[in-house]
Amino acid sequence: MRNARVLPAVLFAIAPLYAHGATTAYRIDPVHSQVVFNVEHNGFSRSFGRLKVTEGTVRFDPDDWSKSSVDATIDLASVDMGDAEWNKAVRGASLLDSDRAKTARYVSDSVEKKSDDDGIVHGKLTLRGKTLPLDLPFRVNRIGKTIYGLHTVAGFSSTVTLDRAAYGMTSNKNSIGNDVSVWLEIEAIRGGDAQTRSDKETPDAPAQ
């Protein structure tokens, strides 16, 4: 009988801890996260580029998405267009201006659930010194252990269109399109799960 009385008391005491811990913090993994973008090139084709997500935190509550959040930093100097001269031009003052503002940052204001796997992050993007509202539709791909069980990972995908002129990138209007299609692939490691060099993909090691 004593145990019957003690058990409810213990459960009552620890319940707030579980409730508080429902929102899990994940550290963005720069090895497996990236931003890919493309823009029209003089009507002939769409040119593709890539940027590195250097750091950030995703907080995600699978039971209440409204408690979730994201804060991510993108290295503008990391832009890769597949050509050294083109990289230099895109980093220049008329476009990304990475010498003056080396990073872009996205910070959420709220997260809205739309379906079992899809939602929208309402937030703001700071780029080239301008901070503007930006909503990111996203999909939760998977949350779980890596195949080797090294850590727990949350994976997300998002696509959005940016108006480059809104951020002051108004040059080359006749040759470069204004609307930039952006594709984000994010993997984030649960807080407390350490990432080691062995976690990273190498030519001799499979993806984890």
Where are the language model's segments positioned?
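Bacterial N-terminal signal peptides that target proteins for export
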Residues: 1-8
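Bacterial N-terminal signal peptides
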Residues: 8-16
